[in-house]
Amino acid sequence: MAYQISGNCIGCNACVDSCPTKAIVVQDGEYWINPLLCNDCEGFFPEPQCVSLCPGSAPQPYEAMKGRNRTVTARIRSSPPLFLNGHSQAFASSIVVWEACNFLSQFQSLNLQKQGDNQVCYQKSVGHNQGSLTLTLCLDGIPQSAPIDVRTACLHLIFAAYAAGLDSPWKESFVFTDSQLESYLGWDKRKDLSKMTRLHLFMTWIEQLCRIQVSIDWPDQGRVKGFSVPAGPLWRLLKMHRHFQKDEQGCNHLVGLTWAIQPGEWTRYFLNRQGCRQGQAFYQYSSLPLSLLQAVMSHWQHHEGAMRLLLWLLFKVRMGRQQRLTVPTLMRVAYGEERLQEAYLNLQERKRLVRTFESDLEVLNHYGLKPEFDPLTYPSSIQPLWARLEAVPEDADEALNFWIEDANNGGLLTAAGPRGKWGLLMQARIQRFHLPSDWHRQAVQEARSPTRESGSRQRRRAKSAPVATDSDLPGPPENPKDFPSSKALRGADISAARRQKGISQRELAQRLGRSQSWVRDVENGRLQISLNDRQRLIKALYLDPRQQQV
């Protein structure tokens, strides 16, 4: 049973130091007991210390405040809100932010080094092993059962977005409220979490974030000379202001929170706009999709591996168009090296891991990160069932004919995986992930904005731009009729163009207003297309007939 402090409190502070769970907080002369931390001193004392020591009998059994909470009006002025366009926001995306995101999302599966004073350390080599980046976390007061929640990485990315809006983040700070966090994470529409539970989670996650220490030893890189950043906070908590509301008995109830955070010293070298122009520092930023934050908050419990991949791919896709990712690499990110090694030795664990991995890939596909399987190393026989079922037509009659044809071929579509599927998966690759539109929108705007970069650097940046989806590609030719129409499009041309654009047969059929079986028959050469269909295909695939195969 939890307790609360009534208006009879005389302010003797006898209860504050004696509370074993540190649930009692004093702010501006107001006393408040966190009901989620107060446990009646169970396991510490035979009776609650606040009750036994209080001379005025102020502590009373906790009762939730009835009615709606009043709107908090006396807040500290917060920083400008994020995601004003409703889709994305620029955020600091340097290697410090990336590795800290990995540290938070993969905490329970990383090979961490234990240090004295109950600390764990994560170290990453940089600059061809000439430098290092070290993250350290003190575990005092953090439960061992679930020390770090993957959702903490979402707040880390929100902090990085706030930091990107500061001119000199190592000298400035940003202010935000619990209501803003709820809107970013999609909690403003959820009814399954009480207000007190949300506030307690925010307090826990932000406390964990501000405990992380980062130290950097960076070698020379281009015009930027080597530098060292001594151990300091990744994010420094300057202030956390609690907003209370009193009930009829004079007991305080927490109804809101406001934080002031200052980015660490690392931003002087990785988020320094002026220093970047002078060749003395880096200024690295990218686009943070709002949908990513809300997807993590929705799927973290049942698909934690998929959410780890989602957070990792947010940074990985910035490194080039053709990032051929092996299945073992993705599994290490999603489940950790230890579980992967266990699967090598245990048949049942292999089966469970493959099922989990294919389910997590499906979650990413539904989100909009569509994997493109390498046809040589990742053939359809070992692809997930959901990927193979995309070939099934939506029309009932066509679907019936499709299944009849598949049955005549031995039921290849739904057949069990081949013998030795695990070994084949360990050699399989995913060529790339096609991105949803909100992942690419900011990149397109950045490419169009004027910069001071040299031509060669701009060309390198263009080569490493993220992969766009169909909606982000340039429009079709202004007048497709100008293309020569003397030679009919070949099925191989259509299939190659469709695969190059990352479009499935079903998507192409929807664009053309045709059935999926019609597209399949055209690509297989069983149907000849009319001039009208040919022009519509050119529009859909932006295909130049002058580049057809001979």
Q: What are the roles of these predicted feature ranges?
A:
Residues 1-11, 22-46, 58:
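Ferredoxin-like iron-sulfur electron-transfer modules
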Residues 9, 14, 492-511, 536:
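Short basic helix-loop element that most often maps to the first helix and adjoining turn
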Residues 24, 494, 508-509, 519-522:
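Conserved hydrophobic/aromatic packing and binding residues within compact polymer-binding modules
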Residues 37, 346, 513-528:
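Recognition helix of helix-turn-helix/homeodomain-like DNA-binding domains
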Residues 57, 532-547:
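DNA major-groove recognition helix of helix-turn-helix/homeodomain DNA-binding modules
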Residues 65-489, 500, 506-507:
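Charged, alpha-helix-forming regions
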Residues 356, 507, 518, 528, ...:
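Residues in the helix-turn-helix
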